[in-house]
Amino acid sequence: MNDQGIKESIETLKEQIRKYDYHYYVLDEPLVPDAEYDRCFKALQQYEEQYPQFLSPDSPTQRVSGTPSDAFMPVAHKQPMLSLSNVFTIDELKAFIKRAIEKLDEPNQQLVFACEPKLDGLAVNMTYEGGILTHAATRGDGAVGENITANIKTIASVPLRLRVSNPPKLIEVRGEVYIPKADFEAYNARARELGEKTFANPRNAAAGSLRQLNPEISASRPLAIYCYSIGACEDYKLPNSHLEQLNLLKEFGFRVSPETRRAIGVEGCLDYYQYMLAKRNQLPFEIDGVVYKIDSISLQQQLGYVSRAPRFACAHKFPATEEMTRLIAVDFQVGRTGAVTPVARLEPVSVGGVTVSNATLHNFDEITRKDIRIGDTVIIRRAGDVIPEVVSVILEKRPINARKIELPKNCPVCGSEVVREADEAIARCIGGLYCKAQLKRMMWHFASRKAMYIEGLGSVLIDQLVDEGIVHHLADLYELDLQTLANLPRMGEKSAKNLLSALEKSKKTTFNRFLYALGIREIGEAGARVLAEHYCDVESLKSATIEELMTLNDIGPVAASHVVHFFAQAHNLEVIDRLLELGIHWPKPEKIQVNQQNPFFGKTVVLTGTLSAMGREEAKAKLLALGAKVSGSVSSKTDYVIAGSEAGSKLIKATELGVAIIEEDEFLKWVNS
């Protein structure tokens, strides 16, 4: 083959791989099996090794490379990359729009806005010349940023070449690099396991990952990007609408936020603000507000800029999720398994529109790692329904009399000894069900929906039953009578009858629900199901050894030792015997023959998004019946991801890891066959 033929073969392979990458990473529509992709990629690598004269910087094989020699060298933006002015109230938004209308000298004009979520990530500028990515930079001071080209190339959804046959001579594409929330939590959890540094928040994680001297470190981080505007553009006619320019970016091969909307006037902008504020906690990524941009590019050009911000756009910030306050004391709460958790008492402060006076400190390892002391000025975070937490200490504000936090020697509830094993971060009260705090939490767990499901037995009633000495252990619940219950404050005869009916109804259960309800440490729903499938009744389970238990899927040495320890305790066996005597029972499980030829047998499967044909729990049950293991997170060990509509970060991570994606229609064919 002559040089021309070789070059044509290389270009054909590059174009094929770009097409596969675009469908896989951007559209989430894989065109070919992994093996075919790998074959094409390897063929391209071999060509480029044999004929290095045809190796080009836009080749898919150059997405991850060694340490760049020009790391963090300054890069000037062709068009300034300015920050947005912020508004925080409705009045400020009205004033911003009023100023724009007055500047345009069209007092009766209803302005049309492009509205977008304001991602809390790192802004970047990517420059393409002749359709090829030549360099990328951070925002920097707006005029000059840092060269992060090699690191940007590690983000799979960033096209190395634009997907058009007639690209602009030069174009700057602006976007926000971020780490999805689920991936951030998984990364930090893994880092903690390995004793490595964790990140305070997803934005810091994204920024730190992009500013790595070694691009391979960036490649190992779950970075993603949404593009939001065009900077300089040469020899190409752009649409006169910001929303249409975003559609053009999609055609070029970029990811654009699906939450972008068109709005008219103040009311339209405020509707979008409320919509995104309500949806904020369900999004797979962090946002700290919304952005309004006048949609007309010609109007944008008329308005121009003031100082270092555009007159045609602003950011409407959400109430802060992080605030600063003073830690004035530490109390200790006792959980179901005796875990003693430190809780910070704070000078009340408004965070995200809610007054916060308490925050979790997690455990003593976290207190030591963050060096938190009583009297410190601390930063607290409240995100959605998550319990507020102390994120960090502002050491410059530490008073001379700041006191170290001491682990109590005795339980604050029952006075029993508090112990902490050498290999555990958590300290525990050894009082067991003698401790009222543990008994209350145990009863609440026992009565919960996924356990015995005793409707009407809530935390207030549990407090009454325990505090007044009516209930001393779980079995006492099933010996309650109408008169005792009806005489309780705010109870009454009708409520008492309803509770007794719920208790009677709960007696018919399943073995796995009963095991889960017992609250054995390290045994959750999945572990209880595994034990129930293998042992069928209490008698056979209580004689199991650690070695036997460890042969079961999902039962490791720690869980196995807790199971053996639980059934070795005489008082636990007494409670179980009494519960069974009082009528708790379950049908003997039928041996179901699973077709081991089905594609899910023995595989690890993750569900994501919304399935139209069934709920998440029903889908999970069907997968378990097919012999699958259902996991809540995507990793390299995941075999399949079943994707419904509005799938988020799990789907992104699956595509980045090369995990097979199964659409709902294909899934339904198997479960209904």
From Swiss-Prot:
Keywords: DNA damage, DNA repair, DNA replication, Ligase, Magnesium, Manganese, Metal-binding, NAD, Zinc. SUPFAM superfamilies: BRCT domain, DNA ligase/mRNA capping enzyme, catalytic domain, Nucleic acid-binding proteins, RuvA domain 2-like. Its EC number is 6.5.1.2. It catalyses: NAD(+) + (deoxyribonucleotide)n-3'-hydroxyl + 5'-phospho-(deoxyribonucleotide)m = (deoxyribonucleotide)n+m + AMP + beta-nicotinamide D-nucleotide. Pfam families: BRCT (PF00533), DNA_ligase_aden (PF01653), DNA_ligase_OB (PF03120), DNA_ligase_ZBD (PF03119), HHH_2 (PF12826), HHH_5 (PF14520), Nlig-Ia (PF22745). The keyword Ligase applies. InterPro entries: BRCT_dom, BRCT_dom_sf, DisA/LigA_HHH, DNA_ligase, DNA_ligase_AS, DNA_ligase_CS, DNAligase_adenylation, DNAligase_N. Residues 595-673 form the BRCT domain. GO terms for cellular component: cytosol. NAD(+) binds at residues 34-38, 83-84, 116, 139, 176, 293, 317. The active site is at residue 118. The keyword Nucleotide-binding does not apply. One of its GO terms (molecular function) is DNA ligase (NAD+) activity. Zn(2+) binds at residues 411, 414, 429, 435. One of its GO terms (biological process) is DNA repair. It is an enzyme of class 6 (ligase). Belongs to the NAD-dependent DNA ligase family. LigA subfamily. DNA ligase that catalyzes the formation of phosphodiester linkages between 5'-phosphoryl and 3'-hydroxyl groups in double-stranded DNA using NAD as a coenzyme and as the energy source for the reaction. It is essential for DNA replication and repair of damaged DNA. This is DNA ligase. It comes from Legionella pneumophila (strain Paris). The lineage of its organism: Bacteria, Pseudomonadati, Pseudomonadota, Gammaproteobacteria, Legionellales.
